[in-house]
Structures are given as structure tokens and as C-alpha cells.
């Protein structure tokens, strides 16, 4: 599926999901301009993978994604502070869904994590559990929880959901240690 009208798609050199489009942009180093008819996180992903000589242009700067907007960099930093105060941050490996902002992806990398797509989420979680005891899955709680429970046999009680609108995410230090 795509989010552009057919009148726009007919002029596209490449179509696909966000990760494919970012990889395709990077595979064309001769392209001086990458005009990205998508949303912010998609253009940011392409910009991360392309060379400094390439300019990624997003024609509609108001094009956002509710999934990517589920967690802001500030909220994630606050969550990490809560994990630190609970004494578990050193056991946590962040895993972020491709549909997240460049700031969230940078946070994930800075803290030794990885970025996943819906098709490799299980492999990403398996890798993360090899690195640490706990996972902070961003920004989509459903993909993280469903993968852990349905595909990896974890219990729903093994997963807690941090709510950035509540003090300490609505979680106690004990809940964070037990998750």
C-alpha cells in the first residue's frame, strides 16, 4: 500500500516500505536529490543512509506519522532515567521500530540497541536478549509485546508498558525489576 495519490506515484522511480525506500536511496549515490513523498521518519531514515553529497527533500514538512510520534526523544530520555533510578538500565537493551524518529534511532544506538522492522522483530528481540536481560521496545508497544508473547513464548506479565504521561511511567521500581 502507499499513502500517495496515483497521480504522484506515477512519477516515482521507486516505491516500497520505509526501509526499502531508504536502502534504495542509499543504493543510488549518483542521485543528487532524493525527493521523498512520505513522512518525516521515512525521509530521516533515507538521510541517515545516504551520502553527505545527497540531499533528501521532504516536500510536505507537515507530513507526520502517528506511530513515530508515539514517543518523543524527551519522553524516552525520561524513561531511561526511571530505568536508571530503578537500577535496571544497565540490563536494558533498546529496540526501536523502523517507524521512529531519527532521535529515537540515535538514542537506541547510543545505548547499544538495534532498529527492527515488523518482519525481523523476533530476530531483533532474540539478539537483544543475548545482549541484556531486559528490552525497552520503542515506540510501538503492540509490536514489541505481541512479538515477545506470541512469537517468543513470554507471558503478558513479563511485559510492562511505560506511560510517559504518568509519574515514573506509571510503574514501580519493583515492576521494572520483575519485567
Predicted features and spans:
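The feature marks the mature, well-folded catalytic cores of soluble enzymes
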Residues: 2-179
Amino acid at each position: 500500500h502507499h499513502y500517495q495519490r496515483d497521480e504522484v506515484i506515477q512519477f516515482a522511480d521507486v516505491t516500497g516500505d520505509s526501509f526499502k525506500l531508504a536502502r534504495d536511496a542509499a543504493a543510488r549515490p549518483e542521485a543528487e536529490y532524493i525527493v521523498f513523498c512520505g513522512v518525516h521518519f521515512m525521509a530521516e531514515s533515507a538521510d541517515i543512509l545516504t551520502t553527505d553529497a545527497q540531499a533528501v527533500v521532504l516536500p510536505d514538512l507537515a507530513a507526520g506519522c502517528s506511530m513515530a510520534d508515539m514517543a518523543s526523544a524527551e519522553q524516552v530520555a525520561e524513561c531511561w532515567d526511571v530505568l536508571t533510578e530503578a537500577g535496571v538500565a544497565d540490563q536494558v537493551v533498546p529496540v526501536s521500530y523502523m517507524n521512529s524518529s531519527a532521535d529515537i534511532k540515535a538514542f537506541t544506538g547510543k545505548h547499544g540497541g538495534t532498529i527492527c522492522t515488523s518482519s525481523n522483530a523476533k530476530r531483533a528481540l532474540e539478539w537483544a536478549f543475548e545482549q541484556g536481560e531486559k528490552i525497552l521496545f520503542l515506540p510501538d508497544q503492540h509490536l514489541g509485546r505481541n512479538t515477545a508473547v506470541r512469537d517468543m513464548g513470554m507471558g503478558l506479565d513479563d511485559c510492562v508498558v511505560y506511560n510517559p504521561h504518568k509519574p515514573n511511567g506509571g510503574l514501580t521500581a519493583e515492576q521494572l525489576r520483575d519485567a
